[in-house]
Amino acid sequence: MEAFEISDFKEHAKKKSMWAGALNKVTISGLMGVFTEDEDLMALPIHRDHCPALLKIFDELIVNATDHERACHSKTKKVTYIKISFDKGVFACENDGPGIPIAKHEQASLIAKRDVYVPEVASCHFLAGTNINKAKDCIKGGTNGVGLKLAMVHSQWAILTTADGAQKYVQHINQRLDIIEPPTITPSREMFTRIELMPVYQELGYAQPLSETEQADLSAWIYLRACQCAAYVGKGTTIYYNDKPCNTGSVMALAKMYTLLSAPNSTIHTTAIKADAKPYSLHPLQVAAVVSPKFKKFEHVSIINGVNCVKGEHVTFLKKTINEMVVKKFQQTIKDKNRKTTLRDSCSNIFVVIVGSIPGIEWTGQRKDELSIAENVFKTHYSIPSSFLTNMTRSIVDILLQSISKKDNHKQVDVDKYTRANAGGKKAQDCMLLAAEGDSALSLVRAGLTLGKSNPSGPSFDFCGMISLGGVIMNACKKVTNITTDSGETIMVRNEQLTNNKVLQGIVQVLGLDFNCHYKTQEERAKLRYGCIVACVDQDLDGCGKILGLLLAYFHLFWPQLIIHGFVKRLLTPLIRVYEKGKTVPVEFYYEQEFDAWAKKQTSLANHTVKYYKGLAAHDTHEVKSMFKHFDNMVYTFTLDDSAKELFHIYFGGESELRKRELCTGVVPLTETQTQSIHSDRQIPCSLHLQVDTKAYKLDAIERQIPNFLDGMTRARRKILAGGLKCFASNNRERKVFQFGGYVADHMFYHHGDMSLNTSIIKAAQYYPGSSHLYPVFIGIGSFGSRHLGGKDAGSPRYISVQLASEFIKTMFPAEDSWLLPYVFEDGQRAEPEYYVPVLPLAIMEYGANPSEGWKYTTWARQLEDILALVRAYVDKNNPKHELLHYAIERKITVLPLRPSNYNFKGHLKRFGQYYYSYGTYVVSEQRNIITITELPLRVPTVAYIESIKKSSNRMAFIEEIIDYSSSETIEILVKLKPNSLNRIVEEFKETEEQDSIENFLRLRNCLHSHLNFVKPKGGIIEFNSYYEILYAWLPYRRDVYQKRLMRERAVLKLRIIMETAIVRYINESADLNLSHYEDEKEASRILSEHGFPPLNQSLITSPEFASIEELNQKALQGCYTYILSLQARELLIAAKTRRVEKIKKMQARLDKVEQLLQESPFPGASVWLEEIDAVEKAIIKGRSTQWKFH
């Protein structure tokens, strides 16, 4: 009886949850797939407007029944069935189990002044009910005891029947509670409760009686609620609708009912969400989730405490947890930082069913169907099983990736620098798209196409379109992620950078390409807007090796069938034209190998002019007209052979180890047979292009980024040094950086832009603590950067100047070596050496760091004293360490120290295990609560260091302020600590064997870890394991230089002695020979030959320069007698003869010295090397003492 106590109406009415919803209709639409009793699929549409108050009438009676089922769940007499029926507008709900107590209610009887029983109070009196005041662990769905009364108020009639095991109670309520008839009470052993009623439909916006459509719509909705209740109560209680059991006794069955029509054959993931504390732990939530691309937004059905809950914190908790997992998995899978997934994206393909009980919740909203509970309840107490989240996440990410792939196919961009062909439509297959490398190439294409009017046999805009590739193409192979879904399907996902790339997306739009089409059939290819694409690129490494290779890789990645069917072509323009004197038609060569083979067959090229055309812009108007006149013969088609797939993967894929193995060897040049085959078939196999042009570009890129181990220089720095030796040879006056850069670009054929060249020149002159070069090539005049910003604060190339550090450079790189080195030839002219071999191993004497094609290059300069000691021990047989070092080299072991350089470094170097570490220094002032940093670790710029500390939140928690008073030479950084921080720092940043607490706190230590990857002399990469290995590999190269230098000098001296001796002899015999009496030079030469004078190549002997010993020996004695016949009268005088005799004596003395040096031990020229080592050391000492000004 206490459960039905009548409460104060005023307090009761204040609750927002007293409101039951609007009396007007709202639209309820949807389509559900459901099971009938025999499991035949049936679709029940709900598409009419309905009144929320009417639906609430039905729903409240159903919820009362499920509440009763839950209340009796632990009792002896349980609820075994709930029967729901709806026929001709009459709604009924019945359940067994204990009925409403049939007893007189004293308080209500006193108020009504008649006998009132508890069933009447429960159904007809607004101030009484079991749900008015609920405990915190209550799981009832009813609220405030209003539901049954609301049903009675809106009913024409109602019949309440209940039996409590002793009596049966039947009462009729008519005219919306206006007439409450006395109950009929009879003895009965039954236990059940049944409520049957006829709502006042007309007042709620319906026909009275209901129309057939209204009856069907309401019946479908009630049936749905019955199925939901079946899932809620579970298998212990049967739910009937119109006497048929509902077969949705589990959360999975309910999920199938909702999704079988809309998403058939979808996997349903199920789990139980459990809590860790009472009362929540007593009631786990059952969850079933369906993931399907057919769902376009997140939807859920939530049956909580028997109520069809439209929203609540439990749903938010589930969504957020899934989203966190999806975002993490998505980023790990796609590896694209620019692609983001939102909560909406991650949950848009999910349909979730949640069934269960949650204690202590409140119901809000007009229809009391919005769950309200403190949000932290779920975060604190509930957890979702990881296996469920993992499976869900995998399915969701697969769908997201598929949707991204489809969306990206329709990405539209503005296409710049595109001119379409005039023809199109039915003639599209006859059109070609000319893709020019850049603006200058586009100008050539435009010039060629506009010649169409005067050149009928050539191409024109009628059937040709043109587009610019913008001078660069993105490597698409590294911008996709291949993902295998659970179903085994492989999805290629393009990242955001690729889909937003204007150049490649522009090609897709212009050609009409579809990423979802393979173009295997002619019908598919006929849909394209052009019949082919023709690449028009420069004949240099950037054009052929890089841009054309990337374009081919793009088509091979997405549409290999187009390459197979000849869709991708190139305009092969002449690389070299040779103009013979007196002829107007040049000989054209498309590959250097062709030119080399032709040149070898010529007796001389003296009467030929050789012109290189590495850039398309080099062709003049006449040459363009000639090329486009024979345009068809210059268009070559790419073919796709079996090995191309692997090579595309090697050169453009993400597996750097494969590429590194391939690039360890040099390029194998095209053979004459291969070039002939290319021209005869006008076809270029992709594999051949990749193995020659692309590989050459990759190796060239490596040589621009990673130094050669012989000289420690990249190609750019080598060009700068060679240019400096040439430019400053006669006059070492200072020159502006930009002026010197122009000289290098002109004389050393630098093709990568003024900005990068000027930057390299500035770096070569930088000399400050922490700079890359401890031994600068140039003397910088002006501001060349400081330690503060790591050299980035250098002045403009227009304002700062350089001059050669000649005293150091000329000792480190002896001029005599220049004739022995192999050289790079650009445009047929000699440029810089392929490598230098300096007197000391410069590769381990300076700092450096750079990545290239999967390799990392990192070196830490070694101590000059150690290097000098090692090299001298190797060279000098009298050195006490000489034999020991040679023993170590033979066995590849280390015996002498080779420590990191500490020059210009005021910190400390320590070794732990196999690595050295550099340490900064500091001073602690406990009184001022300040730490003063007086040195930073090696090669750490000041500003970068301070920024790294400020980004560390756990360090800044102790720091009040950082003040930088450092100069370019010294470090003075004041770290002001917060009060009482010093002891806390010592506690939190523990001291270890390797560093103390302050060093740890201020990050005053770095590891000198090295990646000793260098370019080999003949190309490719060599990986060293130690600095000793580099030294040991370098030593034989430098040693051989001296033998080659001496042998060459010996050959030259011998030839010059022969020539000078012959001239002296001729002077002595000139009177007898009397050559002036002969009519011509030929007759005179005959006489000299008969008298045993040797014919000599005077120019070669006088200026041997780059001639090798073999050339000297072969060509020097195959000359003529010009060296004698060109002698003037004054050269026949006795004084002149005397000078020549003295010259011969000096040359003979030098020759004897050279012969002696060649016989030296331990190798020829060892003493010369020692002398040059001494000279380099003196230059370095002087340079360091004068800040490399040498004055």
Swiss-Prot record:
Its cofactor is Mg(2+); Mn(2+); Ca(2+). Induction: Expressed in the early phase of the viral replicative cycle. Belongs to the type II topoisomerase family. It is found in: Host cytoplasm. This is DNA topoisomerase 2. One of its GO terms (molecular function) is DNA binding. GO terms for biological process: DNA topological change; sister chromatid segregation. Keywords: ATP-binding, DNA-binding, Early protein, Host cytoplasm, Isomerase, Magnesium, Metal-binding, Nucleotide-binding, Topoisomerase. It comes from African swine fever virus (isolate Tick/Malawi/Lil 20-1/1983) (ASFV). It is an enzyme of class 5 (isomerase). Mg(2+) 2 binds at D538, D540. GO terms for cellular component: host cell cytoplasm. The active site is at Y799. Type II topoisomerase. Processively relaxes supercoiled DNA. Displays DNA-supercoiling activity only when associated with the viral histone-like protein. It catalyses: ATP-dependent breakage, passage and rejoining of double-stranded DNA. Mg(2+) 1 binds at E437, D538. Binds two Mg(2+) per subunit. The magnesium ions form salt bridges with both the protein and the DNA. Can also accept other divalent metal cations, such as Mn(2+) or Ca(2+).
